[in-house]
Amino acid sequence: MTTSTNNQTLTQVSNMTNHTLNSTEIYQLFEYTRLGVWLMCIVGTFLNVLVITTILYYRRKKKSPSDTYICNLAVADLLIVVGLPFFLEYAKHHPKLSREVVCSGLNACFYICLFAGVCFLINLSMDRYCVIVWGVELNRVRNNKRATCWVVIFWILAVLMGMPHYLMYSHTNNECVGEFANETSGWFPVFLNTKVNICGYLAPIALMAYTYNRMVRFIINYVGKWHMQTLHVLLVVVVSFASFWFPFNLALFLESIRLLAGVYNDTLQNVIIFCLYVGQFLAYVRACLNPGIYILVGTQMRKDMWTTLRVFACCCVKQEIPYQDIDIELQKDIQRRAKHTKRTHYDRKNAPMESGEEEFLL
């Protein structure tokens, strides 16, 4: 009786603890939405690659720890954006062997990038907090070498935290089913859901809300308003994270309560599965549009990304200047350089903060 109950629990939980789109219905849905998925993949890939290229190419000399965290956050979003359509296309063309690969691959991409992105967001908020509140006192501690070390640690931590979600699952009966022992099949799925709720949602939001509140109070009381734009960008990033991941985490929380209470209702189960799929879709949309938030809100980021885009566009398209116009072009270039030098001197003279304080987030 215990074995059958555990098997029933495992069957009921298989859809819940699998938080990526792996069921047969999703493969069929991909047939109808393939164009939209690939369009979002192209847009998300372009925006995330543009962010990464801007940080590595345009800002390589004045890169800050915040830029390092944003770059790796874009890498995590890029893995989610690229992973979904390619895994589903592979499943379409190799139906016999690919379901196992898709089951493990999608779970690995989803959870590793989830935990890594959370770590980078937390460090981004803490870095902004240190810059605004502590300022020069932490310049020796706050450097790119330490940020790179933290990035490596966070990626390793994300792989370890996501390991149960892709190593303990296999494709069985058209579903990505968790292979748990009979002794752990009742409580281990609840543990996984709770871990995602706390480590992947509640704790990061609480920490980022605390640091944001402290930064706002410090700026209002002690600093000028020129730092507020950094907080605007950070606030939009945090709010988008909380909004887009809320349905997914709510479904996990409801499923944990359902398992602990021992309630097995088909209607409730279908509602939770639907919420999980909606949450997964919103997470995918957020990974595609997250760089757009930087472009729309961050003035400095928008300028740097636009400059990078123009540089690479000019490299791809050769502009030939007629021989008789070379002197004119040289004179125009000298005038532009002189004008830029005067403007830079004026900006530095009247800047409210040092030029080294200017961050990619602004």
UniProtKB/Swiss-Prot annotation:
GO cellular component, one term: host cell plasma membrane
Topology of the protein relative to the lipid bilayer: Multi-pass membrane protein
Topological domain spans for side Intravirion: 59-67, 127-148, 214-233, 299-362
Ranges that cross the membrane: 35-58, 68-90, 105-126, 149-167, 194-213, 234-257, 275-298
Keywords per UniProt: G-protein coupled receptor, Glycoprotein, Host cell membrane, Host membrane, Host-virus interaction, Inhibition of host chemokines by virus, Membrane, Receptor, Transducer, Transmembrane, Transmembrane helix, Viral immunoevasion, Virion
Subcellular location: Virion; Host cell membrane
A Pfam entry, by short name: 7tm_1
Region span, Disordered: 341-362
Database matches in InterPro entries: CCR1-9-like (IPR050119), GPCR_Rhodpsn (IPR000276), GPCR_Rhodpsn_7TM (IPR017452)
Topology, Virion surface side: 1-34, 91-104, 168-193, 258-274
A molecular-function term among this protein's GO annotations: C-C chemokine receptor activity
Sugar-bearing residue positions: N7, N15, N18, N22
Cross-referenced Gene3D superfamilies: Rhodopsin 7-helix transmembrane proteins
GO biological process: calcium-mediated signaling; cell chemotaxis; immune response; positive regulation of cytosolic calcium ion concentration
Coiled coil (residue ranges): none
PROSITE patterns reported in the protein's UniProt record: G_PROTEIN_RECEP_F1_1, G_PROTEIN_RECEP_F1_2
Main function: Interacts with the host Gi complex without activating it, thereby probably interfering with the chemokine-Gi signaling. May also function as a G protein sink to sequester G protein from the cell surface via internalization. Plays an important role in spread of HCMV via the extracellular route.
Family: Belongs to the G-protein coupled receptor 1 family.
Subunit description: Heterodimer with US28. Interacts with host Gi alpha-1 subunit GNAI1; this interaction does not lead to the catalytic activation of Gi complex.
Official protein name in the record: G-protein coupled receptor homolog US27
Higher taxonomy: Viruses, Duplodnaviria, Heunggongvirae, Peploviricota, Herviviricetes
